[in-house]
UniProtKB/Swiss-Prot annotation:
Function: DNA repair protein required for FANCD2 ubiquitination.
GO cellular component, one term: Fanconi anaemia nuclear complex
Annotated source species: Mus musculus (Mouse)
Location of the protein in the cell: Nucleus
Gene name of the encoded protein: Fancb
Protein name as it appears in the record: Fanconi anemia group B protein homolog
Oligomeric form and interacting partners: Belongs to the multisubunit FA complex composed of FANCA, FANCB, FANCC, FANCE, FANCF, FANCG, FANCL/PHF9 and FANCM.
GO biological process, one term: bone marrow development
Main location, first listed in the record: nucleus
Length: 703
């Protein structure tokens, strides 16, 4: 039996182990190995971890020695869904070749063998699994990787001492960070002042596919990179062909350092030697903590104070997830004496803010006033935030009121001048002074609403200008000023121009660039049109999103945006970005969630309705034909009552025989309108069932 490996997903702890049957004690056992998956969930009422289920999944590897190298919860780039991933080593008895397989756990009853590859050497337990999933390892100073997209082992031809991170870079794609091997002359030189600049970093970024260097700047200065033992990239984005990063580095001097665009911002001295890895815990309300793991030890560093707030020793497992089910993350620390039990007996679950469940006392490193300061901070902060929000709301109302007054005064002044000079314009209606459309700020320039004054000495036959613009608005998005206009004319957009009046002596005009509401989708939301279906946009801003947008234009300044997502988590991420762009008055409507059970139930009911419709159509056609035939027979039967005796019986028998012959050769037809109604009803119900079957098939393929 191999060692036990654990990971966390959706607030549950998953433990993986390999075991055999009853003859596992033989030298070469023949029983097939099974993968045991133990799922545990935290119960807040009892403050304990309870065993939910234990499932054993067969692995078709006979006469082999199996070993779990590592497991991790990674993102499947095919579906953008986080799934538990396990890397298993298989070695046939009396064989020197090593076979490796990557398994994805979709649910408790289904395991997907994603990749299988063979090597002539064994991988150690330091092998890493990244999102993709992508497996990286090092052998004889050479780096290799395999991914689900390539499907084969690929060699990295670069001379690197280590690979610290691999993932998606926003606006670029897959990349990785590696420490370049220092040359001999650099090893003998002393560090100069230029060595401390971020442009001379030996930590470089590379493109995974082409293995070309993206940047060696804005990462880590050379003076720090020689001491780095681990790097965790917080954020990475390609801006104007330059890589911008925020990363956390662990050094040989037992330090945790935060770098932003190559500049060391903050540093913290760690309590234990030999830091190995770091995880980020997001406790909500801008409370983040860095969970640093050591051999059998761990500590937590606050992002705000950049100090150690807790530390633990004699540990066997450290995981970060939403174990309490409150919507924010917590850290699970499992001590050495309880990992193999069905129910964890020694653990700690905390977010260092409000949640703290522990079977052992927490070793805090704060001063004696930290607890009182911590309590007062979270008592005062919500009240201050609420007061600040109310102040912003009050300020917005004042600005709207002042804007309304200015608009009303301008319109009233225009109406007064029109009345003095005998013009027929009246006060604007309520719709003209309504200022809350689309949440945009109205333009109140005098140049737009001005009227000719007597000093201008205009002729009497001067034509009144055609007012084609009913209202104008502006909206600031990042560094751009977006101007919207509600037009009343039916002219084409290429016949219009938009003028920006800075002052009376400086006026500039330019052609109308966009007359629809799709600019924000393409630029600010970073969407891309699908060539095969131009009305659908692919949302590419999030690296783990994979959402589709459908924009239906209603008016020049109004439309309906439909979002198609594969999960609720992706939907929340899309809404988080949309709220920053959309106006405040827009409304949201949650349509429906189509899971597998819903589709199966809907399909069964639709098939039942299809069967009932088919039966009713057949019955209606038969009743129509039989009704016409019965009318013909009924007229013949009325004359049969006049005959008596034997002659009447003979004729009655003769008519019965003739009736059967007519029934055999009868052309059973219905009229056109009845047939069309029956066929249409049957076609509609069959179309519904076919659409549900297609949706269910796509759902199964996505899983």
């Amino acid at each position: 039996m191999s060692k036990q490996s654990s990971c966390a997903i959706m607030g549950k702890s998953l433990s993986f182990s390999l075991s055999r049957g009853e003859r596992a004690d033989l030298e070469m056992p023949t029983d097939p190995l099974v993968l045991g998956v133990k799922r545990m969930m935290f119960d807040r009422e009892t403050s304990t971890f309870l065993l939910i289920s234990t499932v054993f999944l067969n692995i078709n590897e006979k006469d082999s020695h199996l070993k779990i190298l590592c497991c991790n919860c990674v993102s499947d780039l095919r579906t953008r869904i986080n799934l538990p991933c396990v890397l298993i080593q298989c070695r046939k008895y009396n064989s020197e070749a090593f076979k490796y397989c990557i398994l994805l756990l979709h649910n408790l009853n289904r395991v997907e063998r994603l990749l299988s590859f063979e090597l002539n050497h064994a991988l150690d337990e330091n092998t890493k699994i990244f999102d993709g999933p992508i497996v990286f390892w090092q052998y004889l100073n050479q780096f290799f990787y395999i991914s689900s997209a390539i499907g084969k082992v690929t060699t990295i031809s670069l001379m690197l001492s280590s690979i610290e991170w691999i993932g998606e870079i926003e606006n670029f794609g897959l990349g990785f960070l590696g420490l370049a091997e220092p040359s001999e002359d650099k090893c003998t030189q002393k560090l100069s002042e230029s060595d401390y600049e971020f442009s001379n970093s030996s930590l470089c970024a590379y493109a995974l596919k082409s293995q070309e260097m993206l940047s060696n700047g804005y990462l880590i200065p050379l003076a720090y990179s020689t001491m780095v033992t681990h790097v965790h990239v917080w954020a990475a984005e390609m801006v104007d062909h330059q890589l911008r990063t925020s990363l956390i580095a662990l050094t040989r001097k037992n330090q945790l350092i935060l770098f932003q665009n190559g500049i060391p911002v903050r540093a913290c001295q760690l309590p234990f030697p030999g830091p190995r890895s770091v995880q980020i815990l997001d406790a909500g309300k801008r409370n983040r903590f860095f969970i640093v793991s050591f051999p059998s030890k761990a500590c937590a560093v606050s992002e705000k104070k950049f100090k150690v707030v807790a530390k633990w020793e004699q540990l066997s497992l450290v995981l970060v997830n939403d174990f309490a089910g409150v919507g924010t993350e917590q850290v699970l620390v499992v001590f050495e004496d309880s990992l193999d039990a069905d129910q964890l007996t020694s653990f700690t679950v905390t977010d260092f803010v409000k949640i703290w469940y522990s079977t052992k006392p927490l070793d805090c490193c704060e001063d004696p006033l930290a607890e009182e300061e911590h309590e007062n901070y979270y008592l005062v902060l919500p009240a201050l935030e609420g007061q600040l929000d109310n102040s912003f709301i009050f300020l917005n109302k004042i600005q709207q009121h002042i804007s309304f007054k200015d608009k009303f005064i301008a319109k009233s002044w225009k109406a007064l001048l029109n009345a003095v000079y005998g013009k027929g314009d009246s006060l604007p209606s309520d719709e003209m002074v309504k200022l809350d459309q689309d949440g945009l700020v109205p333009f109140c320039d005098e140049g737009e609403d001005s009227v000719p004054t007597p000093e201008e000495n205009l002729p009497d036959n001067f034509p009144e200008p055609e007012h084609i613009v009913e209202q104008t608005w502006c909206h600031v998005l990042d560094d751009d000023l977006v101007v919207g206009a509600k037009v009343t004319s039916l002219k084409e957009s290429n016949e219009m121009t938009l003028s920006l009046i800075m002052n009376q002596g400086n006026r500039s005009s330019f052609h109308l660039m966009k007359c629809h509401s799709q600019v924000w989708l393409l630029k600010h939301m970073k969407c891309e049109r699908i060539q095969e279906c131009t009305e659908i946009y692919l949302y590419k801003k999030l690296r783990n999103c994979g959402a589709l947008f459908s924009w239906e234009q209603r008016t020049a300044s109004e439309g309906i945006l439909t979002i198609y997502c594969r999960s609720q988590g992706v939907l929340f991420q899309c809404l988080d970005h949309l709220i920053k762009v959309l106006p405040e008055i827009c409304s949201f409507k949650y349509l429906k969630v189509e899971n597998e059970d819903f589709l199966v139930d809907h399909l069964s009911s639709t098939l039942e309705a299809e069967l009932v419709t088919f039966c009713s159509v057949s019955t209606s056609a038969f009743e129509y034909v039989r009704g016409g035939y019965n009318c013909r027979i009924r007229r013949t039967d009325n004359r049969a009552m006049t005959f008596l005796g034997r002659r009447a019986k003979i004729r009655q028998s003769k008519r019965k025989v003739q009736r059967e012959r007519i029934l055999k050769h009868l052309n059973m037809t219905v009229n056109g309108s009845s047939y069309a109604e029956m066929t249409l009803a049957l076609a509609e119900i069959q179309l519904k069932s076919d659409l549900i079957v297609k949706t269910l098939a796509n759902f199964v393929i996505a899983l």
